[in-house]
């Protein structure tokens, strides 16, 4: 057998999931092959050229903390940065960057080409090589066979992909790319549960045909935020402004008059679209009382005139697209460079996955990204990292690793998918995390980088930077706990200016920092000292001080929940034998087959009373004693 054809991990697909999967496997020193139908589209931003947002920015920070690429690529390609929810608490603050598509792809490709233990090869995969109940490789359209004990499928919208513009449709993985229909047919022969989803994209506009004088300017933040814990504002290219406009009643009337030509409303499309990123047709129909809908005018890059009008995703016929676009203020003379379209594709029920993202039916086969029913670059990249990491661990005969819900948004994402499944494209929000005060953007490295180091996906540069930051936090926290300030050391006027009231007794510095409106900077001014630490360290110290009580309560709640989380349920448990459970609950438990009691609590329809009955049954059957809990 030729060495060229033998690898330890094969990743199929070069999108956001595939690139993170390949890098995560290769960083462990595992010989990895990334197969893509087109090397030129590695890291392609198929829809909106943006990274981050509410919940999504948290995922990007966690990917970065585990040594992933997305945050660094966003920093090096980001041309417009904003901190969303900046006036709210730290748990829901989220970074978002508008990226230059070409720059982003270039950063991703360079990282892949420079990664040791990683090879790239351009070939479409058409089949899996299966031996018994294990995947052992893949076959390509040229008839080449590549062997590996672990295969990660990150095929996006390419499985059975069909593109719709009006009542016209054709096969396609995305505009300009062929679908993976042969692979889709092969996977349908396996015992996976398969369904259809759809997503869409707006028409692209030539920015030279837009009248910007009629649009509202949306500048980026100053100072400019940074995504990566290794990054700085100096990494960013030139920054530009975005703009805002709105649809109007004329736009809505054009859309309503054309609904009979919409593939969504004519029944041509059966797949369910993303709830939180609906098409403009959906918005007009579902929110008929609204006189207008906001549109964000976002540049596609520094070296192109193309504009992404975020908010008017559509699959209406092209003539209707022209009419609705030109009905919008500032777009009266707009020239469409690419039509909007919807794409319908296969996805596989993620309840057929293990928490490691390995499939339950074929050992060594992992799924990540839109194949699991998610939407978004960030959700895909997070899954890719975990799948690639675990594929690498498996070939090294090591135990799988995946974060719990209380450890990371990545853990929330995976647990939601494998426990509840999804009937629509799944998008991450901060509201999905019950422990979001602990899972902030700012502390993703403190939560995950030590674990990443143990798993060999965090390099020496990141590890040194992390330790410097962590030691600075510990050292400064200790100083603030020990150092005191007396009333006679501060003038009454200075105290009133900085604290809002005179200093009436002796305080430890940490006590003053716990006050809601006292920043670390104000505290240093109060004691007449310069900033002792860098801003990221100061931010972390202030948050930990102000939210100490809330954080402690959440940690106690997690400890209580861990009793359920750690109780593993036997794989052969017959739920129909558990007396008192309703037939509905029995069927749901039997279908999902939760791995732990904690997972069972999160299945929709499984009540606390049902969990109590299950606990009683387990005690009687002596399962608790056998598991040592």
Swiss-Prot record:
InterPro entries: FAD/NAD-bd_sf (IPR036188), GIDA_C_N (IPR049312), MnmG (IPR004416), MnmG-rel (IPR002218), MnmG-rel_CS (IPR020595), MnmG_C (IPR026904), MnmG_C_subdom (IPR047001), MnmG_C_subdom_sf (IPR044920). One of its GO terms (molecular function) is flavin adenine dinucleotide binding. SMART domains: GIDA_assoc_3 (SM01228). FAD binds at residues 13-18. It comes from the Bacteria. NAD(+) binds at residues 273-287. NAD-binding protein involved in the addition of a carboxymethylaminomethyl (cmnm) group at the wobble position (U34) of certain tRNAs, forming tRNA-cmnm(5)s(2)U34. Belongs to the MnmG family. This is tRNA uridine 5-carboxymethylaminomethyl modification enzyme MnmG. The gene is mnmG.
């Amino acid at each position: 057998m030729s060495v060229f054809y033998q690898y330890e991990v094969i990743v199929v697909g070069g999108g956001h999931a595939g690139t993170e999967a390949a890098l995560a496997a290769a960083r462990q020193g595992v010989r990895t092959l990334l197969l893509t139908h087109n090397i030129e589209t590695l890291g392609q931003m198929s829809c909106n050229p943006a990274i981050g947002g509410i919940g999504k920015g948290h995922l990007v920070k966690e990917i970065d903390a585990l040594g992933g690429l997305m945050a660094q690529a966003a920093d090096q390609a980001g041309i417009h940065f904003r901190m969303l929810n900046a006036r709210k608490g730290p748990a829901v603050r989220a970074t978002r960057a508008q990226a230059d598509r070409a720059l982003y792809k270039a950063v991703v490709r360079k990282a892949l080409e420079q990664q040791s233990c990683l090879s790239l090869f351009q070939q479409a995969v058409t089949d899996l090589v299966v031996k018994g109940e294990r995947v052992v490789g893949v076959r390509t359209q040229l008839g080449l066979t590549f062997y590996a004990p672990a295969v990660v499928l990150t095929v996006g919208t390419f499985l059975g992909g069909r593109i719709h513009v009006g009542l016209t449709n054709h096969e396609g993985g995305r505009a300009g790319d062929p679908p993976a229909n042969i692979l889709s047919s092969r996977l349908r022969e396996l015992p996976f549960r398969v369904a259809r989803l759809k997503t869409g994209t707006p028409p692209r506009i030539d920015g030279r045909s837009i009248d910007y004088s009629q649009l509202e300017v949306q500048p980026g933040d100053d100072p400019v935020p940074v995504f990566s814990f290794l990054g700085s504002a100096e990494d960013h290219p030139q920054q530009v402004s975005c703009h805002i406009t709105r649809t109007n009643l004329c736009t809505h009337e054009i859309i309503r008059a054309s609904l009979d030509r919409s593939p969504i409303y004519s029944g041509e499309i059966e797949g369910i679209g993303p709830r939180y990123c609906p098409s403009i047709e959906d918005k007009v129909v579902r929110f008929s009382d609204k006189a207008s809908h906001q549109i964000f005018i976002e540049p596609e890059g520094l070296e192109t005139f193309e504009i992404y009008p975020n908010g008017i995703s559509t699959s209406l016929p092209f003539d209707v697209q022209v009419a609705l676009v030109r009905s919008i203020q500032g777009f009266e003379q707009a020239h469409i460079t690419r039509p909007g379209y919807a794409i319908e594709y296969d996805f596989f029920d993620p309840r057929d996955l293990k928490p490691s993202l390995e499939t339950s039916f074929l050992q060594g086969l992992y799924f990540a990204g839109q194949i699991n029913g998610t939407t978004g670059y960030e959700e895909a990249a997070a899954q890719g990292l975990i799948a690639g990491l675990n594929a690498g661990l498996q070939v090294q005969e090591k135990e799988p690793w995946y974060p719990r819900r209380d450890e990371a948004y990545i853990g929330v994402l995976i647990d939601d998918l494998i426990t509840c499944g999804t009937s629509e494209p799944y998008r991450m929000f901060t509201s999905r995390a019950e422990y979001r005060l602990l899972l902030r953007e700012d502390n993703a490295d403190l939560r995950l980088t030590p674990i990443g180091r143990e798993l060999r996906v965090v390099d020496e540069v990141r590890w040194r930077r992390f330790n410097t930051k962590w030691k600075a936090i510990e050292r400064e926290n200790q100083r603030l706990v020990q150092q005191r300030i007396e009333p006679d050391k501060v003038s009454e006027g200075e105290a009133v200016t900085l604290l809002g009231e005179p200093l009436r007794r002796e305080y430890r510095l940490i006590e003053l920092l716990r006050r809601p409106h006292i920043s670390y900077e104000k505290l240093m001014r109060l004691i007449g000292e310069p900033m002792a630490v860098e801003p990221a360290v100061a931010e972390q110290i202030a948050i930990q001080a102000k939210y100490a009580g809330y954080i402690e309560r959440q940690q106690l709640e997690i400890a209580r929940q861990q009793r359920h989380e750690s109780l593993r349920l036997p794989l052969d448990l017959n739920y129909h034998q558990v007396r008192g459970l309703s037939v509905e609950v029995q069927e749901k438990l039997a279908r999902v087959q939760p791995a732990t009691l904690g997972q069972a609590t999160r299945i929709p329809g499984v009540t606390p009373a049902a969990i109590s009955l299950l606990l009683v049954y387990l005690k009687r059957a002596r399962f608790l004693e056998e598991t040592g809990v």
